[in-house]
Amino acid sequence: MLPTILSISYEHTYAYLSKYQTAYACEGKKLTIECEPGDVINLIRANYGRFSITICNDHGNVEWSVNCMFPKSLSVLNSRCAHKQSCGVLAATSMFGDPCPGTHKYLEAHYQCISAAQTSTTTNRPSPPPWVLSNGPPIFGNGSGLIHPPGVGAGAPPPPRLPTLPGVVGISGNPGLFNVPPQHTAVTHSTPSSSTTAVGGGRLKGVPTSTTTTKHPAGRHDGLPPPPQLHHHHNHHGDDTATPTKPSSKLPAGGNATSPSNTRILTGVGGSGTDDGTLLTTKSSPNRPPGTAASGAVVPGNGSVVRTINNINLNAAGISGGDDESKLFCGPTHARNLYWNMTRVGDVNVQPCPGGAAGIAKWRCVLMKRMPDSGYDEYDDDPSSTTPAPNGGDCLHNSSSCEPPVSMAHKVNQRLRNFEPTWHPATPDLTQCRSLWLNNLEMRVNQRDSSLISIANDMSEVTSSKTLYGGDMLVTTKIIQTVSEKMLHDKETFPDQRQREAMIMELLHCVVKTGSNLLDESQLSSWLDLNPEDQMRVATSLLTGLEYNAFLLADTIIRERSVVQKVKNILLSVRVLETKTIQSSVVFPDSDQWPLSSDRIELPRAALIDNSEGGLVRIVFAAFDRLESILKPSYDHFDLKSSRSYVRNTAILSNDSDVNAGEIQQRLRILNSKVISASLGKGRHIQLSQPITLTLKHLKTENVTNPTCVFWNYIDHAWSANGCSLESTNRTHSVCSCNHLTNFAILMDVVDEHQHSLFTMFDGNMRIFIYISIGICVVFIVIALLTLKLFNGVFVKSARTSIYTSIYLCLLAIELLFLLGIEQTETSIFCGFITIFLHCAILSGTAWFCYEAFHSYSTLTSDELLLEVDQTPKVNCYYLLSYGLSLSVVAISLVIDPSTYTQNDYCVLMEANALFYATFVIPVLVFFVAAIGYTFLSWIILCRKSRTGLKTKEHTRLASVRFDIRCSFVFLLLLSAVWCSSYFYLRGAKMDDDTADVYGYCFICFNTLLGLYIFVFHCIQNEKIRREYRKYVRQHAWLPKCLRCSKTSISSGIVTGNGPTAGTLCSVSTSKKPKLPLGVSEEAHDDPQQQQHTPVPITEDAIMGASSDCELNEAQQRRTLKSGLMTGTLQAPPQTLGGHVVLERGSTLRSTGHASPTSSAGSTHLIFAHKQQQQQQQQQQGPLGEGYYHQPDYYSWKQPPTGTGGLKTPREYYNNTGASASSPQQAHEVFYWTQKPNSGQHGKKKRGAGGVPASPSGSLHSRTAAASQVLFYPSYKKTKAGQPTGYPQYAEALDPPLATGNAAAYYQQQQQLRRQQLHQQQQQQLSSDEEQVEQHAHLLHLQRRAGSQQQLPAPPPHMAQYQHEFMQRQYRNKHSNCDLGMGDAYYNQGSVGGADGGPVYEEILSNRNSDVQHYEVGDFDVDEVYNNSVGTGVFNNMRAAVAAGGSRYGGGSLSGGSVSSRSQQQQLKKQQQQQSLAQQRSARRCTADDDDDEEEEEDEEATAAEQLHDSVCDEDEEEDESDLEDDAHGLPPQSDERMRRLMAMQDEDFKRRFQRQLRKHGAPLDYGALPPGSGPQPEHNGAVFGVSGGVGEGSMRGAFRQQQALNAKSPGGRLAVNDLFGHGNSGPPLPPANQTPAQKRQQLQKLSPQSTTSSSSHTSHSNPNPHPLQLTHPHPHQHPPHHQQRHLSAMLDENNTVRCYLEPLAK
């Protein structure tokens, strides 16, 4: 029966760690070993002696030997304790003998408690690797990067000392050492045999108790650490030893009993190189006769030799010799002046030492793994090449199932292709080579009468001039110690103190010089001739020899003195100080003594005084150069960071996959500072009362990390950190603190220089893709954040907006931190910080996703479904929970183990430990599960609500919530895919997993999709955001024309034409199915035939895609049409004049909504209409200026078109009573506002503008506004078909001859008051309400950016003297920007009304976030009430004149109006004359060209125009003075005051401008008494103005303020909402946004025409410097008829906007 085969791996090693135990008993005590019932003792190894100075040493004696052992210790213990449950052995020399007299010894036993049943079934019990059973090795072992030459003591004379066990004969009779030499032996388990002998060459020839000797030098490049030493003070001669296995009591009857070899690829560092290598190991059979070789060659015998290389069974591979085996040889080479012939793998080549040196040199041939770029694939198996297996084959020892041997042979051959024979180590082993000169010095120093000074001088000369070998280093340090010992006795022979000091000082100089020679670079090859352990021993001997000689001098000096010995590589200072002179700390070295390094050591005063003797303190300092290259740290400590290298190098075949992927591996450490030494008194390990401080400079600053303060332990021959701590560190220096004295240095970890960052493992393509993916995602996240920031007026400030803003911020931080982290290395100072912040950002991001899902759930389960408003307390709670919890978790993680953020390979992952799962994985999973749970709950509620009967608005809101939930769920899944793929990719790449690339490309794809998803579903799909994008593109001239002229960038159309080319659009427009036939020629009023042409059809895309800011292919005047879906046909009437586009509509009009002047960017007046009939708009060519163009719904919705195309006079229009009978009543009305260019500014600075340039938006207040602008402001009212009620108050607004003078006089009266207040209001006021409006109002520009052949329009008559400024404004207008309309999808398209006759409601949508602002009433001017009052008197006077002389106005009467007396008309004439004179005087103050202006005023119309211009000029100068006086009358700010004021402001501004326009033209219009259902439309010019035109910005604010001042005594001073839309008779019954407030109407009703007129006349006559009229005490004289009040109901809709429903008019 074959014995049980056990493969030992690291995984099994951890199992052993839990079972193996160690017991100690000091000399004279009893060692007791006891196991649990049912278990028996299985001894592993034992020793009676001493290997450690710390065990059983209560008094700290350092003179005892630490190389003491009794070889038969294990045999004695086995006889007493083997296979027993408990036993006891007395640790005494009577039992074990006395291996080292004078040393206090102890008994040490390593054992294992095994089940008693195992002893009867197991034939072979393999022992674990000895390094697993290490008895607490020092923190850094003896080894170094330098190699231990293989074969030293193993095959070359002098023969090694092998353990002498029962049946084992030591080589050459030398008693062998039992212990395993540190880092140089590995255990090979085999079947027991009877004897072990050694053959020539040092190779072991084994039978039954076979031992395998392998070397594990330090410094492997594959990272596998050599086994740490069991003891640290033994085998100072570098002899190799073997550990025998325990013989078994039962053996199989026959057959080949083989056990696997545990030999790994051996590594070593020869010089500066690192190599992998293996030794050939043997496995013997029980029947193998003694004397057979075990070196790897097949030795004849009764048994077979199982030869393995790197655990590769060469027998199974079919490699038995011949050509296949002949390839496993190292080629010949030259090294160290010797020729090394071809050597078989596993053999040691031995030669005599070169250059006449005594001894032998050795070099071993091993099998090394090829570099990765060798082109061979380690696992490149070809399953197709199989052949039958002879004799059934064998099974690999660590395979779970047997495979055919031929297939195994193929795998072995493939495996061996990755290895090549190599000499190991890099240089031969010349430890036994000694030169003749040093041999001679060694003989002389041992002679009694030799001169120590002469020997020291000769030694310094030899070491500086002769070539030394490895053995010479050992001899030299031994001579140094011998010289110091002899000088200690010889100095007493010199009676003179000075002579003694001189002799010892000379000896010290020679010794220091010799030590410097040994450290010189020329002797580096001599150090490399030594194995690592010998290097450590030689270095320790050198340090102690120098210290002994230095203290020899210090003890000789009896007074305060300082001696400095400075040579090339050593600075030594001996200081003898008197305690009374020590005032502060002692510092070494001085700044000028040692320029090679900036290291510094500081001894505190208290520590020095405590160690004084006889009032003197003796200190020895030393600084060394190049010693750091000798005292290299060993690698007996492990970490989990580079386990992949172990897995790659250990897994030989596919069935090696059971090797744990997390196996431990070495961490490369270097000595990264010079060695500096300080010794105090006679003891080297004196505990100081106060710690010393060391400042050490780093030799290497790149790719190093984790500094550790260490000292050199003379006893352990290793670096240790006991008693030292790191105080601070930076890139170049570290500060340490130690409580004892010895040799100090800094150890640091080395980051693999070939893998500087995470990207080093990426191939070129993947690295580029990762950059692109992260860049795309970052760009889209930034766009989303800027969208939320720049277009915040579009969004409702709600919890969902805040949540998504936080999510975007977290994702942006994650992307940026990941991008930074993958470029950092472990040594970077930012590495740990990046990992910490990335941890926090991921936790915060997942928390926000959870809160977003919870918010959707709470919205559906509460009253928030119909009202999405700001929820500040809830959002603050989200902030606290997300960021607070994340920071708390990270803080706890930092407190528990800060190294978890710095111990990983890359700076984007935490160390995969329990803390990682507790603080990262579990919180993330909790948040994700909670988010998914709330999402499913929300979906269930949505399904339930969808099946119940809800209102229309609830269904709309549910649809919005349903869309949000879907997007959030997809967003969450996509983000999970991104993070999971990135995690698995990093882990896979770290372990060199083949699937890592798959995860990597998945991460690239998912991350890119994440960015696109954020942009598309969170930005593009939102109609509001799309509209704002278009607006932003339009309003910024720095953007390229291709964007601003694209068909998707604006929703306004531009149609131009001249004759047959009418309707030509921008070249960027594309043609689709024509829907909007439109076309009007500029010269239509001149050519009646041309007016009859068929309109040129234009397309929907033309309307949507044209831009007023684009260069067009024609130079004619443009016509604008607000975009909208209009069904039916649009015909151009033959009477169209000016710059307007007239549409005759049929069927239904569906408007996308046009921006109200009182609304924000997201506000509109919705249009609902059905079965609208054709309508006409008639315009009359007039001078460029203000004009009021009112669609004639207030008077007559249907103006019957004339067959001839002529225009009816205004008188005919208002006197026509039969129009309504012949044409149906149209259901709605439309208002168009016009703006006059800023012709009267003369460069004056407007209030609120400051030094800021004019707005480029081309809005109402822009200085670069167009000469003609159209503001589409639709507002519709339901009126009954037939004869609408008359509106007689319109007659008083249309009397130009009477109104012109009054207006001019009014502005003259206000001029002085405003000038007095101008200096108090400069730069102190905010933007006026009109300037607030300009940010929201929508304008479509005319006459903008014409072609090169287009002629600029001629300036109006009153602008003739300002030709230059007019041209400049036209030029600026050409380069101004486009404005934006509304998108079609944003507005509701249905009608809440019904058919004709049914109630139709108006809806006014006002974005509360923009409209609701706080303003004082003081923002409005006072002066306008007077103007309105005068206007009312003028209206009444005009009605009286019409009644008296009806023939002038075409006959008829005014219905519903009052008739004024003839005396009132006379007063108005006088008032007009005075105003004309005053206006001429004020005109001189406005311009420097007044004299020329007076000569040009030849007729009344020109005078009126000039007067209007002068008043405008004065108004611009004085508008800043209008607010200060009335600030005291302001009302407290109200939440809805902004919207109300703007509504009232629009009404006042319209009336004022309407009156001013009529005065300027001076042409009377006959309103008549006919119903407004018939008659032509009023005449007007082609220019259009908006809410606040260019004539006088802010001039309409005073009326509202005055009215508020008059009503300040009313309770609260608020405006009633219902009064906003009441129909009064103080002005035109405008749409809801233009209604006069009830409070103001009541005040105006108190002003009679007589009082108003007389007040105006009195002021004009009596006061040459007019002052404001006193309107606070009006005298009511006549009350106009009161019209119907319309009540308003308001609510907040789902978009957080105010939705007003106006009561329908009476039928």
Swiss-Prot record:
Subunit structure: Forms a heterodimer, consisting of a large extracellular region non-covalently linked to a seven-transmembrane moiety.
Record GO terms (molecular function): carbohydrate binding; G protein-coupled receptor activity; mechanoreceptor activity
Compositional bias segments (type: Basic residues): 1674-1686
SUEL-type lectin domain boundaries: 25-114
Cellular localization per UniProt: Cell membrane
Higher taxonomy: Eukaryota, Metazoa, Ecdysozoa, Arthropoda, Hexapoda
Region of interest (Disordered), ranges: 176-301, 376-400, 1169-1188, 1236-1260, 1316-1335, 1450-1538, 1563-1582, 1612-1687
Residue ranges of every copy of the GAIN-B domain listed in the record: 561-754
Chief location: membrane
Record-given protein name: Latrophilin Cirl
Cross-referenced Pfam families: 7tm_2 (PF00002), GAIN (PF16489), GPS (PF01825), SUEL_Lectin (PF02140)
Biased composition (Acidic residues): 1489-1503, 1513-1526
Membrane topology: Multi-pass membrane protein
Biased composition (Polar residues): 185-198, 256-265, 1635-1650
Segments on the Extracellular side according to the record's topology features: 1-767, 823-828, 897-920, 990-999
InterPro entries assigned to the protein according to its UniProt record, in alphabetical order: GAIN_B, GAIN_dom_N, GAIN_dom_sf, GPCR_2-like_7TM, GPCR_2_extracell_dom_sf, GPCR_2_secretin-like, GPS, Lectin_gal-bd_dom
Residues glycosylated per entry: 142, 256, 302, 341, 398, 655, 703, 730
CDD domains assigned to the protein according to its UniProt record, in alphabetical order: 7tmB2_CELSR_Adhesion_IV, Gal_Rha_Lectin_dCirl
Residue spans crossing the bilayer: 768-788, 802-822, 829-849, 876-896, 921-941, 969-989, 1000-1020
Keyword tags: Cell membrane, Disulfide bond, G-protein coupled receptor, Glycoprotein, Lectin, Membrane, Phosphoprotein, Receptor, Transducer, Transmembrane, Transmembrane helix
Residue ranges with Low complexity bias: 275-285, 1172-1181, 1316-1326, 1456-1481, 1651-1673
Residues where Phosphoserine is found: 1156, 1255, 1262, 1327-1328
GO biological processes: adult locomotory behavior; cell surface receptor signaling pathway; proprioception
Annotated positions for site Cleavage: 741-742
Cystines in this chain: 709-736, 724-738
Region (GPS): 709-754
